[in-house]
Regions:
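Acidic, His- and aromatic-enriched active-site or binding-groove loops in soluble protein domains
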Residues: 10-15
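Catalytic alpha/beta core domains of metabolic enzymes, predominantly
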Residues: 5, 20, 25-178
Length: 191
């Protein structure tokens, strides 16, 4: 039982799976997370992963599923194992947004797997990924570094009108106003 729209996770580019899952997604008015791998596994080549994502998006459209209901996971790889993993992920995310106009998601902590100071790396990656067009991420909202990076990236990208979320998270009214709070500060200026 759920409220809103169901989200079917991990639909890969395997033809057999697409023909089974996509009709069910359409029938139930669900959205789908498209995973950028197929029968051959996960390619390290970002062009191959993009092509698989494009195939899934096109196949979904053939079944009447709108692009807005397809969220692509470009499969972020660990930078400790693949030196160019960050550049590859950012390239794919940018192309998915610009060329296909789809929403994206990723397991953000995959990027830092096996490395120290994972929150620091994940924060840097997330800020850059948002800049490239990432629209959602699976991450730990309890890590302050990650939250700061996401909120900051949203400010930089113009996704936080009037910096409302940033201010709501970080403003300390009493300290910003010399201990008088917001109202005290305003009154102090009018005297």
């Amino acid at each position: 039982v759920y409220q809103g729209k169901a989200l079917v996770n991990s639909v890969t580019g395997e033809d057999e799976r697409l023909e089974i899952i996509l009709p069910m997604v359409k029938k139930h008015g669900a959205a789908v997370v498209a995973i950028s791998n197929d029968e051959s596994g996960i390619s390290e080549d970002p062009d191959v992963r993009f092509s698989i994502a494009k195939k899934i998006v096109e196949r979904a459209a053939d079944h009447g599923i709108p692009r807005g209901d397809v969220v692509v996971d470009p499969l972020v790889m660990p930078v400790g194992a693949i030196n160019q993993a960050g550049c590859q992920a950012l390239s794919i995310i940018r192309r998915l947004r610009e060329e296909l106009g789809v929403n994206t998601t990723c397991g953000a902590s995959n990027f830092s797997f096996g490395l120290p100071n994972r929150n620091g790396l994940n924060s840097s990656f997330l800020a850059m990924a948002i800049g490239a067009g990432l629209t959602s991420a699976i991450t730990n909202p309890l890590h302050d570094e990650v939250v700061s990076a996401v909120l900051g990236a949203n400010v930089v990208m113009g996704l936080d009108p009037n910096c409302a979320d940033w201010i709501g998270k970080f403003r300390e009214p009493a300290s910003d106003a010399g201990g008088r709070g917001r109202r005290g500060r305003r009154r102090g200026r009018r005297r």
